[in-house]
Amino acid sequence: MLRMSTSRFIGQRLFTTARSLQAAKPAPKGKTQGFSKKSSSVSSYSSAKRVTPGSLYKNWTNTTHTAQLQQTAVPLALPIFNFDDISKTLNKVVSYSNKQYKSLHHLGSFKKSQFNELFQKPVCLVREDATNSFLKKLVSHPVKKFIITGEPGVGKTVLLSQAHAYAVDSKQIIINISYPELFLNGRNDFSYDDDLKLFIQPMYLKKLIRKILKANDPALLKSIELSKDYKFSNANPKNASVKPFVTLNKTKNTVLDLLSVMTHPHNRGKLMKAIIDELSVQSKVPIMFTVDNFSKVLTTAYSAYRNTENKQIYSLDLQMGKLMMDIISGETKFANGESSTILAISGVDRTNKTLPVALGKIPVDPYVTRYHYEPKFVELLQKGNVTEFEVPKLNKQEVNELIDYYKQSNVLLDKDITGKKWENLIDEKYFLSGNGNPRELLKSLVLSHR
């Protein structure tokens, strides 16, 4: 009995003694106790990478896009793209006019992954089966609503830029949404507009309105008079203190004045609606509404934005999503009969069954989830009678024309020029490009060596 009590006592003493030994020593007087830091001559935080003229501090695509590499490109005299005289430039590499370049740059028609830095300015090949065929359909088709399809890298964005150039020459007003992901990815400010009953994105709308203003001819915008009066709060820092509101009169002001309004963010949704309303009711000037990377919309029924219940916001509850689909479906109609709507899908986006069902290529599967199929989008596309135009691959004659231009631009390697017969080189590059894919053709020429 005594031995058992002693063992318990000793165990208790050992337990309490162990706790006292493990306890940290009190901090010296005048110092606060904290976590110990490892003494090291090297800081735990890596220093910022030093940016020098020769360093690669961006990824490859952004570096080549912004490094001004086109300044060292070989200047070549090329014919100018002109649809009215397209027979003279068929199957030839052409450049754009200065007016076209200015508009297309503002519209965002040229993308980073197109290797435009290899040449002084972006160029294109005028193709019989793509450029000429599509623009002829655009002019003659009774319902001018098209969706451009094709495999990745086949030239869908290039064809869309050629349509933009045609619109510039034919004096049309162009509205282009180059990256729908920018209003779907949840990275813009947004708020709910009680009057519109939609979620608006003020900063995105500000950039889009500026794009429309800068990309189009001021004389065209000025020629369209307003159909009614408007009043917006004034956010112009120059005179906002003495002029709290901007008033536009239908007898004095034009669409150019409407696009130039500087208003507060909460009113920007109403400003965008007013712009679309004015462009749709007028019949003087044709409107070309285009969307590149439209496959992002078709595969993103729910945006990355969330409402007050922490639920993802449906794409058609965003002002931009509804505005776009209203134009496509015909809910918003442009009064001018020459107006058109052109969509283009992208190979960088995932695919689902929405577009094939809308085009009648496959039947509806009632058991598929909304991740793979969005019935509302199918309904709107079919309501708008959207016609598919599939961009074909290059034929050998077009590959020959492109490689000849690349040779003149000093893009070809010396081993390709001197070590092979020209016919063998064409056959080889045609095969390496996947039987005529323009992007893969250029990759096989410029990215095939170390």
Curated annotation (Swiss-Prot):
Classification via SUPFAM superfamilies: P-loop containing nucleoside triphosphate hydrolases (SSF52540)
Keywords: ATP-binding, GTP-binding, Mitochondrion, Nucleotide-binding, Ribonucleoprotein, Ribosomal protein, Transit peptide
Compartment(s): Mitochondrion
Transit peptide, residue positions per record: 1-14
Disulfide topology: none
GO cellular component: mitochondrial inner membrane; mitochondrial small ribosomal subunit; mitochondrion
Binding site for ATP: 125
Gene Ontology biological process: mitochondrial translation
InterPro entries (alphabetical): P-loop_NTPase (IPR027417), Ribosomal_mS29 (IPR019368), Ribosomal_mS29_fun (IPR017082)
Keyword Aminoacyl-tRNA synthetase: no
Molecular function GO labels: ATP binding; GTP binding; structural constituent of ribosome
Record bears the keyword Protease: no
General function of this protein: Component of the mitochondrial ribosome (mitoribosome), a dedicated translation machinery responsible for the synthesis of mitochondrial genome-encoded proteins, including at least some of the essential transmembrane subunits of the mitochondrial respiratory chain. The mitoribosomes are attached to the mitochondrial inner membrane and translation products are cotranslationally integrated into the membrane. mS29 binds GTP and is probably an active GTPase. GTP hydrolysis may be linked to subunit association.
Family to which the UniProt record says this protein belongs: Belongs to the mitochondrion-specific ribosomal protein mS29 family.
Subunit structure as annotated in this protein's UniProt entry: Component of the mitochondrial small ribosomal subunit (mt-SSU). Mature yeast 74S mitochondrial ribosomes consist of a small (37S) and a large (54S) subunit. The 37S small subunit contains a 15S ribosomal RNA (15S mt-rRNA) and 34 different proteins. The 54S large subunit contains a 21S rRNA (21S mt-rRNA) and 46 different proteins.
Additional notes on this entry: Present with 1300 molecules/cell in log phase SD medium.
Protein name: Small ribosomal subunit protein mS29
Gene (name only): RSM23
